[in-house]
Structure formats: C-alpha cells, structure tokens
C-alpha cells in the first residue's frame, strides 16, 4: 500500500477534519512509497526516527509534529534565519529522514476525534473511567465521565496507579483532597480548557501540562474552587497510540504496524 493511500484513508473516515486546515499530513518522504512496515509513536523525535530507520520500517506514524510547531513546522524551519539553532537541528533532522527513505506521516486531528478508539476515549478507558462519556465538548476531545463519588485525592491516587505503568507514578493536584467528586472532565494535548469543563458540569478536571499552564488555566481553576489533576502530555496520549497501532493493523492489508512506546516525557527524580 502506498503512503498516500494510508493518509487519504484517515481523511476519508474523519469527516470532522477539514482537509484544507488539518495538521495531518505526510511531513517527509515519498507519498508514492510502498509501505509494508510502520512504527507508531507519539512524537517523531530524533530518537524515534533513528529507531525506525535502524529497524527497517518504511513509515513512522506520529501524533505530534516533527519540527516543534503544530501547523507549519517544516516550512517554519526552512524559512527561519540562517543563524537559527532550531533551523540547524531541523535541517539535520530533515536530511536524516530524506537520506533514509523513511516516510513520516502525522495523524493528529483524525485520531483526536475518532469515536471510541481515538485519543480521549482511549485515555478514559486507560484510567478506568468508562467507555461512554456523559458529555462531549464542541471540539470533540473534551469529555465528561460520570463515576461513583470519591475524594479528589482518591481519584488522583487511582490515576497515578494507572499512569505509573507508562512512566508517571505521581500526578499534580490542585484543590481540597477531601472534596468528593464524580463528574470528571478529561482532555489531552491542547484540548484542556478548564472553563469548558466547568460549563460541561464537571466538578474536577484531569488535564495535561501542554494544554493547561499553571498561571493561566490552573490558577483560574484554583480561584474558582475547581479541582484539577495534571499529567504529562505524552502520558495522556500513550493509550491512544496503542489503539492507533491496532487500527493500522486491522485496516490496511499488507501493512504491519508496531507500537514504539513513549509514555511520560520526563524522568522523575526525587531527593
């Protein structure tokens, strides 16, 4: 199967994606290249690209951008000033991929909104919150799950017990640990606007670091007496990479996909 056919399939099944505006694309590589083996990973880091090349994959499917910008990542690197350090590293990264023949495909918008198996659904199942959200925000990837009442700290401990398996054994918490909560907002990536969760009737929110910085969203939540649990961006989307790998294996004849774990982006070091 050609790389372009895999990309076009995702656009064809994602009617919520505007092809003219989506960040989903073949970032690097020949769209006409035949793909037999693909590796699926959360972000196309240099390490992940090297892994793909060293292990003979034809395609790397990434959820996040290759060149550190959400929309026009490659163009921004190529047009950056000649003395830009980002440009230097970006062009080195680009050259490595081009010389290898690897195809880099970004699948972000399609997988964020894929019902039941996409990013927020996979995250909720991983956390044990359920399979069907009680409410979904207008942008599709902010969900509310109604669960049996428990204290905020009990919920945080329950989440940490799950995320420990992918490298994050502790989570950040804002709010009274004894507060009883049951209507839980969850989101990943940039889809973590806490005001939206409040409007959805949530009494606590589970967000990620890239989508909720402290001095803006989270401090507003604290001042509004709305509890927040925060994890790393990579942690929250790892379960969705597992489901994406399975989807590729189930959908594309002649293509074998393998999952390259990423998990929490940080090592956690104590005293």
Give the label of every model feature segment.
Residues 1-271:
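Active-site catalytic microenvironments in core metabolic enzymes, especially phosphate/sugar-handling
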């Amino acid at each position: 199967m050609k790389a372009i056919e895999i990309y076009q399939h995702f656009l064809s099944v994602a009617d919520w994606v505007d092809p003219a505006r989506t960040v989903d694309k073949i970032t690097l590589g020949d769209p006409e290249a035949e793909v037999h083996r693909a590796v699926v990973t959360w972000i196309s880091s240099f390490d992940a690209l090297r892994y793909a090349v060293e292990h003979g994959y034809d395609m790397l499917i990434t959820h996040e951008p290759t060149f550190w910008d959400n929309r026009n990542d490659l163009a921004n690197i190529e047009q950056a000033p000649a003395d830009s350090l980002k440009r230097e590293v970006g062009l080195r990264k680009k050259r490595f991929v081009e010389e290898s023949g690897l195809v880099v495909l970004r699948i972000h918008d399609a997988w964020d909104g894929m019902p039941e198996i996409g990013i927020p659904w996979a995250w909720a199942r991983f956390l044990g919150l359920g399979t069907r959200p009680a409410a979904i925000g207008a942008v599709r990837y902010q969900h509310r799950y109604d669960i049996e009442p428990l204290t905020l700290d009990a919920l945080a401990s329950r989440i940490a017990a799950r995320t420990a398996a992918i490298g994050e054994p502790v989570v950040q918490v804002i709010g009274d640990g004894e507060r009883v909560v049951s209507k839980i907002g969850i989101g990943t990536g940039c889809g973590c606007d806490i005001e939206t969760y409040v409007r959805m009737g949530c009494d606590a929110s589970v967000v990620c670091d890239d989508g909720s910085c402290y001095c803006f969203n989270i401090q507003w939540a604290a001042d509004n007496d709305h509890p927040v649990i925060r994890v790393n961006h990579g942690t929250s989307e790892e379960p969705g990479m597992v489901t994406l790998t399975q989807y590729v294996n189930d959908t594309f004849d002649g293509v074998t996909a393998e999952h390259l774990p990423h998990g929490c982006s940080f090592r956690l070091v104590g005293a």
